[in-house]
Amino acid sequence: MFAISLGDDGAELRPLEPWRAEEFLAHIDRGREFIGRYIGLAAAATDIESARGFLQSYAEKQAADGGRIYGIWLDGTLVGGVLFRVFDTAQESCEVGCWLEPSGAGRGLVTRAIRVLIDWAVLERGMHRVEWMAAAGNTASLKVAQRLGMTRDGVLREAYPYRGVRHDMEVWSVLAPQWRELRAAEAASAR
């Protein structure tokens, strides 16, 4: 078990594993409507079996080096998470994603957690491209991509059928050289 501090506000990033299914389900239940506005995660975890199954699918992805999932804890309570939806070492490309319950929103938790994931993907694993995809109406998610210094690559028109409506999906990305420059500039300005 490990935890990575996300700052001085008590926020931590930890692996989200199948044995945490009850805690994960309680978290999803607290934020079901909020979480489900733009992503299907709330519908994927409706009882303990489906919550455990969802987390198990990511344990299997991690074992195959094809994805990973982490929870964001704030003062000991699971309030959200981040993940590698896709992790393709052959293509040196991955896709990151996130979710939060309302109590975690507006604190910069996702931006800080995704920064940890991108650092690991680029600096440790040699990923060249990190993608972020979000429904065009999900302004909070799009603002995270902007804060991370990602570039808007384009829009996949009506590519995401969700709750009976086809949504446009915005594609954002950061390339390894760009990420290294951004992180170097942040380090220089912190001195």
Model-derived regions, located:
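A generic local structural motif
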Residues: Q56-S57, A159
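Conserved GNAT-fold acetyl-CoA-binding loop/helix
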Residues: G36-Q56
